[in-house]
């Protein structure tokens, strides 16, 4: 299961955890994925989108 936004294609970002001694270990910043249903061509389609994309869809009255 890929952690990717179905509409925008955004995926996780990578960075570092930093301890008090400033040791760096790699980590992932995952998206806040939400399941939403959108009507496309008269059919209901379930998508996994980021919270930001879902907010934009709500603002444009698409969900």
Curated annotation (Swiss-Prot):
Pfam families (UniProt xref): Ribosomal_L28 (PF00830)
Output one GO MF annotation. Answer: structural constituent of ribosome
Biological process GO annotation list?
Answer: translation
UniProt keywords, alphabetically: Ribonucleoprotein, Ribosomal protein
Primary gene name: rpmB
- What lineage is this protein's organism placed in? Bacteria, Bacillati, Mycoplasmatota, Mycoplasmoidales, Metamycoplasmataceae
GO cellular component terms, A-Z: ribonucleoprotein complex; ribosome
- What family does the entry list? Belongs to the bacterial ribosomal protein bL28 family.
According to UniProt, the name of this protein is Large ribosomal subunit protein bL28
Cite the residue spans of the region called Disordered: 1-21
InterPro entries named in the record: Bacterial_rp_bL28 (IPR050096), Ribosomal_bL28 (IPR026569), Ribosomal_bL28/bL31-like_sf (IPR034704), Ribosomal_bL28_bact-type (IPR001383), Ribosomal_bL28_sf (IPR037147)
The coiled-coil segments of this chain are none
Q: Identify the Gene3D superfamilies for this entry.
A: Ribosomal protein L28/L24
């Amino acid at each position: 299961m890929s952690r990717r936004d179905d509409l925008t294609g955004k995926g996780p970002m990578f960075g570092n955890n930093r301890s008090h001694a400033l040791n760096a270990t790699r980590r992932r910043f995952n998206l806040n994925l939400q399941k939403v249903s959108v009507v496309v061509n008269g059919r209901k389609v379930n998508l996994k989108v980021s919270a930001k994309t879902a907010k934009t869809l709500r603002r444009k009255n698409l969900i």
